[in-house]
Curated annotation (Swiss-Prot):
It comes from Gallus gallus (Chicken). Residues 1-19 form the signal peptide. It comes from the Eukaryota. Glycans are attached at residues 200, 249, 329, 448, 464, 485, 512, 582, 924. This is Contactin-1. InterPro entries: Contactin-1_2_Ig1, Contactin-1_Ig3, Contactin-1_Ig6, FN3_dom, FN3_sf, Ig-like_dom, Ig-like_dom_sf, Ig-like_fold. Residues 985-1010 form a propeptide. SMART domains: FN3, IG, IGc2. Belongs to the immunoglobulin superfamily. Contactin family. Interacts with TNR.
Length: 1010
């Protein structure tokens, strides 16, 4: 049994803190329930033999919790025999859909409170059988598309997968460009039917959730023989508007009928395809993995063959189940204080927030409680929910009341303060409610003044510390539960001072730079130096290739910057630091180097072969920019190339230029690189992608030619122009042709830019006639130049002569020899031999073609003892001539299926004598005429072949290595199955039988062949 798990995410954040109002050593260690396992959505197969289903629930708590379960918000009576509990796990015996389907919640409690689990749905899965009615035959002309409907039976859930059987189980059809099975509806789509598609088809449906499969009654598909016609692309599998959840994988299907098989292309309207998109199933399936919000948009599938194209669009919407931005955690609050518990979730649509306290509905929205009391303590759950899911955050609220105590956090016994500096003495007792604070120095009570301040949190601040401030300081804390104090001694130290500060430095990229930093400090304290660049502390371990410190002299923090790069420029700060105070000094490092990237590329004007660009200067890195270089890239290439510009040399003080000699109607991106005396900088960010304006084509198609084809056809071919030469939209070709020597040209238009072929049909066209042809390109802006004129020939007539003297000869049970007398027509290119079994229709005939120099052939892989019809016809590029008269012939019966049983192999001097039993043919097999024996080296296929009518043969003992002896019966139907033994001349030992058994017989080995 498998479980169908929905993504019900539950976050539990329970950290136990004892309630000070229930002080006992045992109570101080307790905490409320924390879920370790929660129920999940489960599908129980209706046909399951398990007889029970479980819903899991487990929580940790001190003291140990109690469990109860709810079904559709009603308490489950666990005293009934149908239910049992193991810990928190609920076991339902003999589950029934009418009583047990629904939403389950596990409720866990102890003395600290109650929490509810996430809801889990128990549903019942099923997959009914297909209807028993037989299907009618589906007859389709060859070349026409077909759709076989699956129509799956009633089922739950909807996660079905589909395949199609061909003729028998478990033979599944192979999917390719021509055949596609939709995983949305299960239908089988065939772009164009071929004779090989003949057969019986069955829709095979599997439900992974309940591990069950069923298949439909077989649907007979019968292709109707016909001269294949061409049909334009026609999309039949169309994806619908799709709603996907953030992070999910999305599958879109698209498939088209048509002849020839249409090419499928995917795109996203006005945007690039997602980086995680993957196209499979010969283009019929688009998968977007881990979909993100930016992947939302309009997607298009385009199907095209040279006869026409079809498009389909639909939108993908991306939404999201709730996810925590800020959630609640276990909290301990003082009695009488205020509570604000932020609980924020993101999702699409925006989730709603509601609260449970001890498993009972409490509030909605944000949670604020003023003047906390002991009654506010308990287990709280924040629930975020939208249409796509629900998440829980659990936390325990403890209310604390206690007198002040410094046991856990006493004041430091010794506090150090730098002369002339500032010191803060902390006072942090544990107390609830918050205590009032007062301070004394010795016996003197301290009050706020110009140098002394007592903060609300109890801390004491002293500024401009002098020797007179040394002494004993005591903090007093008091609330309505009691009072406490803690004392420490303040001692003054010498202040830390920078005595040699770093100086500004100016270097070139690749050079080294040094920054001095020396400090004085209290000799009783340790001194460390910290360097930062532009406010960020330098990590000397990670940056050891460029930064190095002087660690030899304690008071010297000198910094060495090696192989300076542009990124090292900025403000360096040296901080000399002790545990008491610190002192800092800063200096600037100026780095001269190649320019930074220019910015703000704008395209001001777009022409067919030129664009005008402007940009803003980047940083010159303290060396004036001497020139700019503009580079371009088309969507046809990933390579950036230097562009031709006006002016040809762009000086460093310029911020605009024209790019010329561009390709019309081409998508371009541009970037700019600055150069100064120190080198060439990094390129700018690419500009927005633009398309140049269109222009008439100026390149003629090449390789114009053609000829051949079917009767009464003129076939014209050319090499299609690549995309870069289209120069505009609505691109196509104008094909001109005329009989050789005539004046008027006939013109036709080919609108598919990828097609390089046009076939003109004219029943009055004489065969093998010279034509002059030429081709030119056009687009919406005009026509291009014609190609050079080529001379081709119209198609010749199909042969009219019938092959004569056709004769056939049976060679075996699976082979027939066919011969004929050649025809005299010179246009014949070859001969076609058709043959089909008498019990098949002529449309199912198989064909063999040979050249015009051959007047016989062998038909192989025929069925034994079967009547075949055979005819012969001549053909050329224009078609097939009339067939000869049909000849009937019956193949031989099958050769004997029994292998010879080798009964002995005896060595006698330099010979082996091998004996076998007679093979008796079955009634449907050809009679045995004799035996063939092949004597060959082991591992080779060729050897010496013997024929005999006896049941024994002598073969020489091998001089070296092993030999194999093969024995098979021979009949007019062919050779039967083979039996083998191995013999060797190395020793006098017995030969090895490849398939045999040993019989006790006076030193003679008996074998049975296979």
């Amino acid at each position: 049994m498998r479980f169908f798990i929905s993504h019900l995410v539950t976050l539990c954040f329970i950290f136990c803190v004892a309630d000070s109002t229930h002080f006992s050593e045992e109570g101080n260690k307790g905490y409320g329930p924390v879920f370790e396992e929660q129920p999940i959505d489960t599908i129980y197969p209706e046909e399951s033999s398990d007889g029970q289903v479980s819903m899991n629930c487990r929580a940790r708590a001190v003291p140990f919790p109690t469990y109860k379960w709810k079904l559709n918000n009603w308490d489950i009576d666990l005293t009934k025999d149908r239910y049992s509990m193991v810990g928190g796990r609920l076991v339902i015996s003999n589950p029934e859909k009418s009583r047990d389907a629904g939403k389950y919640v596990c409720v866990v409690s102890n003395i600290f409170g109650t929490v509810r689990s996430s809801e889990a749905t128990l549903s019942f899965g099923y997959l009914d059988p297909f209807p028993p009615e037989e299907h009618y035959e589906v007859k389709v002309r060859e070349g026409v598309g077909a759709v076989l409907l699956c129509e799956p039976p009633y089922h739950y859930p909807d996660d079905l997968s589909y395949r199609w059987l061909l003729n028998e189980f478990p033979v599944f059809i192979a999917l390719d460009r021509r055949r596609f099975v939709s995983q949305t509806n299960g239908n089988l789509y065939i772009a164009n039917v071929e004779a090989s598609d003949k057969g019986n088809y069955s829709c095979f449906v599997s439900s992974p959730s309940i591990t069950k499969s069923v298949f439909s009654k077989f649907i007979p598909l019968i292709p109707q023989a016909d001269r294949a016609k061409v049909y334009p692309a026609d999309i039949k599998v169309k994806f619908k508007d799709t709603y996907a959840l953030l992070g999910q994988n999305v599958t879109l299907e698209c498939f088209a009928l048509g002849n020839p098989v249409p090419e499928l292309r995917w795109s996203k309207y006005l945007e690039p395809m997602p980086a995680t998109a993957e196209i499979s199933m010969s283009g019929a399936v688009l998968k977007i993995f881990n979909i993100q919000y930016e992947d939302e948009g309009l997607y298009e599938c385009e199907a095209e063959n040279y006869k026409g194209k079809d498009k389909h669009q639909a939108r993908v919407y991306v939404q999201a189940s709730p996810e925590w931005v800020e959630h609640i955690n276990d909290t301990e609050k003082d009695i009488g204080s205020d509570l604000y518990w932020p609980c924020v979730a993101t999702g699409k649509p925006i989730p709603t927030i509601r609260w449970l306290k001890n498993g009972v509905s409490f509030r909605k929205g944000e949670l604020r409680i003023q003047g906390l009391t002991f009654e506010d303590a308990g287990m709280y759950q924040c629930i975020a929910e939208n249409a796509h899911g629900i998440i829980y955050a659990n936390a325990e609220l403890k209310i604390v009341a206690s007198p002040p105590t410094f046991e856990l956090n006493p004041m430091k016994k010794k506090i150090l303060a730098a002369k002339g500096g500032r010191v803060i003495i902390e006072c942090k007792p544990k107390a609830a409610p918050k205590p009032k604070f007062s301070w004394s120095k010795g016996t003197e009570l301290l009050v706020n003044g110009s140098r002394i301040h007592i903060w609300d949190d109890g801390s004491l601040e002293i500024i401009n510390v002098t020797k007179l401030d040394e002494g004993r300081y005591t903090c007093f804390a008091e609330n309505n539960r009691g009072k406490a104090n803690s004392t420490g001694v303040l001692e003054m130290t010498e202040a830390t001072r920078i005595t040699l500060a770093p100086l500004n430095v100016d270097v070139t990229v690749g050079e080294n730079a040094t920054m001095q930093c020396i400090a004085s400090h209290d000799p009783t304290l340790d001194l460390t130096f910290i360097w930062s660049l532009n406010g960020f502390v330098i990590d000397f371990e990670k940056e050891h290739e460029h930064y190095e410190r002087n660690v030899m002299i304690k008071s010297n923090g000198e910094l060495l910057i090696k192989n300076v790069q542009l990124r090292h420029a900025g403000r360096y700060t040296c901080t000399a630091q002790t545990i008491v105070d610190n002192s800092s000094a800063s200096a600037d490092l100026v780095v001269r180097g190649p320019p930074g990237p220019p910015g703000g590329i704008r395209i001001e004007e777009i022409r067919d072969t030129a664009v005008a660009l402007t940009w803003s200067r980047g940083t010159d890195n303290h060396s004036p920019i001497s020139k700019y270089t503009i580079q371009s890239k088309t969507f046809l290439s990933e390579e950036w190339k230097d562009a031709k510009t006006e002016p040809s040399d762009i000086e460093g003080n310029m911020e605009s230029a024209r790019v010329i000699d561009l390709i019309p109607w081409m998508e371009y991106e541009f970037r700019i690189i600055a150069t100064n005396t120190l080198g060439t900088g990094e390129p700018s960010m690419p500009s927005q992608r633009i398309r140049t304006e269109g222009a008439p084509p100026n390149v003629a198609p090449s390789d114009v030619g053609g000829g051949g084809g079917s009767n009464r056809e003129l076939t014209i071919t050319w090499m299609p122009l690549s995309r870069e030469y289209h120069y505009g939209n609505n691109f196509g070709y104008i094909v001109a042709f005329k009989p050789f020597g005539e004046k008027e040209w006939r013109r036709v238009t080919v609108t598919n830019p990828e097609i390089g072929r046009y076939v003109h049909k004219d029943e009055s066209m004489p065969p093998s006639t010279q034509y002059q042809v030429k081709v030119k390109a056009f687009n919406s802006k005009g026509d291009g130049p014609f190609s050079l004129t080529a001379v081709i020939y119209s198609a010749q007539d199909a042969p009219t002569e019938v092959p004569t003297d056709v004769s056939v000869k049976v060679l075996s049970s699976s082979e027939i020899s066919v011969s004929w007398h050649h025809v005299t027509e010179k246009s014949v290119e070859g001969y076609q031999i058709r043959y089909w079994a008498a019990h098949d229709k002529e449309a199912a005939a198989q064909r063999v073609q040979v050249s015009n120099q051959e007047y016989s052939t062998k038909l192989e892989n025929l069925k034994p003892n079967t009547r075949y019809h055979i005819d012969v016809s001549a053909f050329n590029s224009a078609g097939y001539g009339p067939p000869s008269r049909t000849i009937d012939i019956i193949t031989r019966k099958a050769p004997p299926s029994q292998r010879p049983r080798i009964i002995s192999s005896v060595r006698s001097g330099s010979r082996y004598i091998i004996t076998w039993d007679h093979v008796k043919a079955m009634s449907n097999e050809s009679a045995v005429e004799g035996y063939k024996v092949l004597y060959r080296p082991d591992g080779q296929h060729e050897g010496k072949l013997f024929s005999t009518g006896k049941h024994t043969i002598e073969v020489p003992v091998p001089s070296d290595g092993e030999y194999v002896v093969e024995v098979r019966a021979h009949s007019e139907g062919g050779d039967g199955e083979v039996a083998q033994i191995k013999i060797s001349g190395a020793t006098a030992g017995v030969p090895t039988l490849l398939l045999g058994l040993v019989l006790p017989a006076l030193g003679v080995l008996a074998y049975s062949g296979f």
